[in-house]
Structure formats: C-alpha cells, structure tokens
Amino acid sequence: MDLNLRNAVIANVTGNNQDQLEHTIVDAIQSGEEKMLPGLGVLFEVLWQHASDSEKNEMLKTLEGGLKPAQ
C-alpha cells in the first residue's frame, strides 16, 4: 500500500468522533466497492496497533469465526 494513501486515510479521519468513524466504516462496507478496502485496511492497522494483547486475541477469534466455511 502506498504510504501516501495511508497518510491520506489517517488525515481524513483524524479527529472524528465514534459516530463519524462508525459511519465511515459502515458506509465503506455497505458500498461494496473494492476501492474502499485499502481505507478499511488502514483503519484496521490503527486498531491493531493500539489494541492490547487480549483485544488482539478477541479480534483474531472474531475473524476466525467469521471466516469459517459454511457447513
């Protein structure tokens, strides 16, 4: 990912409150546009970098559960 894109995404949401961040995330997911994926990746990177070990484990469990094959 281009470093300028990462910085642009961070600059675009810096200072946003929780409602604004949620709107950004939900809008990106609901749009279904692949061009939104890098931005979500940057947000996940920030989340991961600021999470405790227990929060990281919880995220990994959630991801694992969400990615299990349908039975």
Swiss-Prot record:
Protein name: Small, acid-soluble spore protein I
Keyword DNA repair: no
Superkingdom: Bacteria
Induction conditions: Expressed only in the forespore compartment of sporulating cells.
Family that this chain belongs to: Belongs to the SspI family.
InterPro entries: SspI
GO biological process, one term: asexual sporulation
Pfam families xrefs: SSPI (PF14098)
Keywords, sorted A to Z: Sporulation
Organism name: Bacillus velezensis (strain DSM 23117 / BGSC 10A6 / LMG 26770 / FZB42) (Bacillus amyloliquefaciens subsp. plantarum)
Transferase keyword on record: no
Subcellular location: Spore core
